[in-house]
From Swiss-Prot:
Disulfide bonds: none annotated. This is Uncharacterized protein YqbN. To B.subtilis XkdN. Gene3D superfamilies: 3.30.2220.30. Pfam families: Phage_TAC_5. It comes from Bacillus subtilis (strain 168).
Length: 149
């Protein structure tokens, strides 16, 4: 039997442009402090972002430093990187919204998120959920370690 006959043929049509299912929005309660008029917890709405956008965020949060004996070293601000992923992933509340930035007196959407999610654990819950929705199943420590290497 020739090698060609043993080769298995795989259907690549599943991976062609236009064949993928778009990422869905996911509602998740992040804090019990945000309630509507009926007293129901207001969920945050998340939607995964593209790999290309994650790459852009990584570049925006990476600096290069000259280290004696090692040359130019790449350094990722992993906390800011993950926070930016979370801001981009959060559809509601939109931390980039002008009204929120003005209300919290900052132009930085990450700062807005920190001020909105000011009770211990809320900010971490929000970050973890955004990371999870983007397909990162590892915990943040593992991701930070991988990003450093």
């Amino acid at each position: 039997m020739s090698e060609k006959q043993n080769e298995k043929v795989y259907d690549l049509s599943f991976f062609m442009p236009g064949q993928t299912i778009e990422a869905e929005e996911v509602e998740v309660p992040i804090s019990k402090r945000f309630v509507d008029k009926e007293g129901n917890v207001v969920p945050f709405i998340f939607k995964a972002i593209t790999t290309e956008r994650i790459d852009e965020l990584e570049k925006e949060n990476t600096t290069y430093k000259n280290v004696k004996g090692r040359g130019r070293v790449k350094e990722l601000d992993s906390q800011r990187f993950y926070a930016r992923i979370a801001v981009e992933t959060t559809v509601y509340p939109n931390f980039k919204a002008k009204e929120l930035r003005e209300a919290y007196k900052t132009e930085d959407p990450v700062e807005v998120a920190k001020r909105v999610l000011s009770v211990g654990g809320e900010y971490a819950n929000w970050l973890n959920k955004a990371i999870e929705i983007n397909g990162f199943d590892d915990d943040l420590e593992d991701l930070e370690e991988a990003a450093k290497n």
